[in-house]
């Protein structure tokens, strides 16, 4: 893999820490600002909504810009939003800053994925994507627990300052190491061509799969810190360590998934999400048992991150070379799930199911995900059969013409 792909992964680690650390920081924010936990949970949804809007919007508005210029610009806006959030401890302003940082993060994500797949051959795109996404698993291993500890011992604002500092360092690295050209592209993408690429029905099924992937995860992960403290009964100091284990599982899943995604994407998606559904059901029933919960958290990270390279590989396989806007819509699709899931699973917290009930919601999303994958596989086989038939029909015509 080219070095630049690993640099992009490092950038995602810095920014992804902000996305994922809220699971552990939410209790501190809620306590500091006098909010209910479910109300503080809307910060997760706000960030996801910013990503949904920002991914296609930033992709279109920066279509003509050099990638290096756009990437650094997104990082600078992201830094400014985190500094603002740390300086003004108001829930309304914090919500606004989460939206702004998410828009910038979405733009960076979209360009990072497109840059990664453009630097490798088609049969290595899934692995390239897995390297970039591995930045998130590193964020869960190092950044998220670190953010949680900072929030617990120095205030949640300190965690935001730390994210801003890490992003600033990676922005300097991008400025130094990333070439100033567009990469392998010989001309800037055309918006009309990019829009036409979105007209494929099976592409939207793949987007649905992406949405359900993140919905399954964030239905549980958004409240995982609270589950570990209030249901499992772990001490506040142990919660960051369990989140580290989630990240370890995620890294293992990405390593395996990245190597399988290009060869057998459908099998990986079905087996991986089937495994996640089983893990979610087990968590719903055993969240009060500490050792079982810890094991299940590791498996949860491994299964959900294990399928993510295949989800992206499916989208980029359908899009082909016209992938700038389509890749951005993938980011938006993922974050529709992130936005909706905490709101849906939050509804069960006040029922007799309690916090552990969020795992049942995650399992339901996982089952729906498998249905979407089966539909995608059916449409793909029909598409391939149609393409083969057209090729076979054109060969006799070509022979007769000669």
Task: Enumerate the predicted regions with their spans.
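Structural signature of the two symmetry-related core transmembrane helices
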Residues: 69-83, 164, 267-282, 363
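Paired small-residue
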Residues: 77-84, 92-101, 291-299
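C-terminal transmembrane helical hairpin of 12-TM major facilitator-type secondary transporters
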Residues: 267-311
């Amino acid at each position: 893999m080219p070095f630049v792909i690993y640099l992009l992964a490092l950038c995602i680690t810095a920014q992804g820490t902000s996305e994922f650390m809220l699971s552990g920081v939410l209790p501190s924010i809620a306590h500091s600002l006098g909010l209910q936990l479910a109300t503080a949970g809307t910060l997760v949804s706000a960030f996801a909504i910013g990503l949904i809007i920002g991914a296609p919007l930033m992709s279109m508005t920066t279509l003509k810009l050099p990638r290096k210029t756009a990437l650094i610009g997104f990082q600078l806006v992201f830094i400014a939003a985190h500094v603002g959030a740390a300086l003004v401890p108001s829930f309304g302003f914090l919500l606004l800053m989460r939206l702004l940082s998410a828009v910038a993060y979405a733009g960076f994500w979209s360009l990072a994925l497109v840059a990664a797949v453009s630097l490798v051959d088609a049969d290595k795109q899934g692995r390239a994507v897995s390297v970039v996404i591995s930045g998130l698993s590193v964020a869960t291993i190092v950044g998220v627990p670190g953010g949680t500890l900072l929030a617990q011992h120095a205030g949640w604002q300190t965690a935001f300052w730390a994210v801003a500092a890490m992003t600033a360092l990676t922005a300097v690295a991008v400025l130094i190491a990333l070439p100033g050209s567009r990469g392998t592209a010989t001309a800037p993408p055309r918006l009309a061509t990019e829009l036409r690429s979105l007209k494929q029905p099976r592409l939207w099924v793949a987007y649905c799969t992406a949405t359900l992937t993140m919905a399954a995860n964030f239905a549980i992960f958004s409240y995982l810190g609270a589950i570990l403290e209030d249901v499992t009964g772990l001490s506040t100091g142990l919660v960051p360590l369990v989140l580290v284990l989630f990240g370890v599982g995620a890294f293992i899943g990405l390593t395996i998934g990245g190597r399988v995604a290009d060869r057998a994407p459908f099998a990986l998606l079905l087996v991986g999400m089937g495994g996640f559904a089983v893990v979610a059901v087990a968590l719903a029933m055993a969240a009060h048992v500490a050792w079982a919960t810890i094991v299940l958290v590791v498996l949860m990270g491994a299964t959900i991150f294990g399928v993510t390279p295949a989800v992206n590989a499916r989208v980029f396989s359908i899009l082909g070379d016209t992938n700038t806007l389509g890749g951005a819509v993938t980011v938006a699709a993922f974050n529709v799930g992130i936005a909706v899931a905490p709101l849906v699973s939050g509804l069960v917290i006040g029922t007799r199911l309690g916090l552990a009930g969020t795992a049942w919601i995650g399992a339901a999303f996982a089952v729906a995900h498998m249905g979407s994958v089966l539909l995608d596989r059916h449409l793909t086989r029909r598409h391939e059969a149609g393409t083969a038939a057209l090729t076979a029909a054109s060969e006799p015509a070509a022979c007769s013409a000669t």
